Regions:
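Alpha-helical transmembrane segments in inner-membrane proteins
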Residues: 1-345
Length: 345
């Protein structure tokens, strides 16, 4: 079998997989809009969307339309964007740090963003999504600066970067706990703790617009550096030998993943393991080339996060679980498998 035939078959496989993933994502989002305390038939969900797009004019229950457009569709779309963003960050960091256990929170950026967002909520610095996002960005930048200081900027090694990220996480988690315990009321503390474990209950269309722009721009930057990421898989020396400006490419990608993570944390809290699990599965299915891996991880991460949000609302209905609890139930066994395989290599 010639190389041209193999390449054609691989292209057909990738195209078919992408189309199937997009269709599955649309179906999962529709399911996410359908389920809840008020169950909405799936055909009503599709008609509500097609009516809004001007494709149909099917009369629908106004309560259903209000629930779909005012609450659930924006929630499902934000969940999809957050899952895609976390998976992209995980794929990038696993290559940059050459570590199978790296994920978006390894640099302490999530903990820093949580501290900034919690400070805005508890101290009443501002109101609305803009203030929350600004607080999260400030906290994420502080955590990133702390890690950069400990690792000597962009020249720090992979091991030093991971250790600095652990230190930053512990520091900012402690600051968050202190802020909540000394400044929040009992009800406010409960609400903040639930949010910190991951929740999409408060997101609306403005949050979707912001996270969509950030994730798409972040994906574009990462795809631009996809060849460099392929080289980083073999180590910094191999990347440098190919003419890649290692310190500056690392810095650009670290900043990109930090901004994506901060945006997600400001809207949904800390949701772990998506950035760990998804890139590994996609790498196994589609190979290590990052131009394919990043897109596959984004689609799979979006699907997984919407499913996790659905499960969080259904497992103990009518109450809701934090989304982070659901992703941990999936991620912890996978984490154990990675450690076991690493030990036996």
């Amino acid at each position: 079998m010639t190389a041209a035939v193999l390449q054609a078959r691989q292209g057909l496989f990738l195209t078919t997989s992408a189309l199937l993933a997009i269709v599955l994502l649309f179906l999962v989002i529709a399911l996410g809009v359908s389920v809840g305390e008020l169950s909405i038939p799936l055909d009503n969900v599709f008609y509500a969307i097609s009516n809004k797009m001007g494709l149909t004019e099917v009369p629908l229950n106004r309560i259903y339309e209000s629930v779909i457009w005012d609450f659930r569709l924006s929630r499902a779309l934000v969940a999809a964007c957050c899952g895609a963003g976390l998976a992209i960050c995980g794929a990038v960091l696993q290559s940059l740090l050459n570590n199978a256990l790296a994920e978006p929170y390894v640099l302490g950026v999530s903990a820093g963003a949580s501290t900034g967002a919690v400070s805005v909520v508890v101290l009443g610095v501002g109101t609305g999504a803009v203030s929350l996002s600004a607080g999260a960005f400030a906290g994420a930048f502080a955590a990133f600066a702390f890690v950069a200081f400990l690792t000597n900027g962009a020249r720090g090694g992979n091991e030093r970067t991971i250790l600095a990220g652990v230190a930053a996480s512990q520091l900012f988690n402690a600051i968050t706990a202190y802020t909540i315990s000394t400044s929040a009321s009992a009800q406010q503390a409960r609400d903040v703790m639930f949010w910190l474990l991951g929740s999409f209950s408060g997101v609306r269309w403005p949050e979707f617009q912001l996270v969509l722009v950030v994730v798409l721009l972040g994906l574009a930057v990462c795809l631009y550096y996809s060849r460099a990421l392929d080289a980083f898989t073999f180590g910094d020396d191999a990347a440098a030998s190919l003419g890649i400006a290692v310190p500056w490419v690392r810095l650009a990608l670290f900043i990109t993943t930090a901004l994506i993570t901060a945006t997600i944390v400001s809207m949904a809290g800390s949701i772990g393991f998506v950035g760990l699990v998804v890139p590994h599965v996609m790498r196994f299915l589609f190979g290590p080339l990052h131009r394919t891996l990043l897109i596959a991880s984004a689609l799979a991460g979006a699907i997984l996060m919407v499913l996790a949000d659905i499960a969080s609302r259904m497992l103990i209905a009518p109450q809701s679980l934090p989304v982070g609890v659901v992703t941990a139930l999936v991620g912890v066994p996978f984490f154990a498998v990675i450690i076991y395989r690493s030990r036996n290599k």
